[in-house]
């Protein structure tokens, strides 16, 4: 069957409304609230999260507000629980409307593989991460995904839209490895073309590659 890379155990969506500083400027309260809503739906605590895929646009205003919201939620978590923070935008830039979906894919692959990929181009930690007791680690090389004893690996994914819409997902690794081995030896490969000659050519290419 199809492989399951992660399951969604909780989510939260809201809008900053009058709390935001401007149309394109987010709100600390709105972002922290949406993360807490997702944790509550998943019936877990901040200590259960091993990795957060941040919205992380790389802007001074946006990143500072997001880090304040994350510190607000995770700052009281146990200091002996390792928790990592990253953003796919450091690798690919801002993917516009696909940014949130790309973050889900990254977090799902990290859960499935048990490895958190590095966040690129981070050389100096920002002030918001080094004040007091930081709840996050920004890794510059691949690291093992933290696995709490007797619990599945879990990740949070944030995506914030222009106009103040905030979304946060809680993902966790699927039970039983996310799938099962198939015993099928034959598979149907659909092939189509605009005419028979091109269909025969395409079929021959498939036979060459799969043979």
Would you name each region that the model predicts?
Residues 1-193, 197-203, 208:
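Condensing-enzyme catalytic core of the thiolase-fold
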């Amino acid at each position: 069957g199809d492989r399951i890379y992660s399951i969604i155990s909780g989510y939260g969506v809201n809008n900053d409304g009058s709390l935001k500083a401007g149309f394109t400027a987010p709100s600390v309260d709105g972002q922290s609230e949406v993360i807490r809503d997702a944790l509550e739906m998943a019936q877990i605590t901040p200590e259960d999260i091993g990795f957060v895929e941040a919205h992380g646009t790389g802007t001074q205003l946006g990143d500072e507000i997001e880090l304040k919201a994350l510190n607000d939620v995770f700052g009281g978590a146990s200091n002996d629980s390792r928790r990592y923070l990253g953003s796919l935008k450091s690798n690919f830039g801002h993917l516009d409307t696909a940014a949130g979906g790309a973050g889900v894919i990254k977090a799902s692959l990290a859960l499935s593989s048990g490895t958190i990929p590095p966040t690129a181009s981070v050389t100096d930690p920002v002030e918001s991460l080094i004040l007091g007791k930081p709840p996050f680690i920004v890794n510059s090389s691949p690291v093992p995904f933290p696995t709490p004893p007797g619990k599945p690996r879990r990740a949070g994914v944030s995506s914030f839209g222009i106009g103040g819409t905030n979304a946060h997902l809680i993902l966790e690794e699927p039970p039983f490895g996310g799938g099962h081995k198939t015993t099928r030896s034959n598979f149907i490969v659909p092939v189509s073309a605009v005419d028979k000659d091109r269909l025969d050519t395409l079929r021959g290419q498939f036979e060459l590659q799969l043979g």
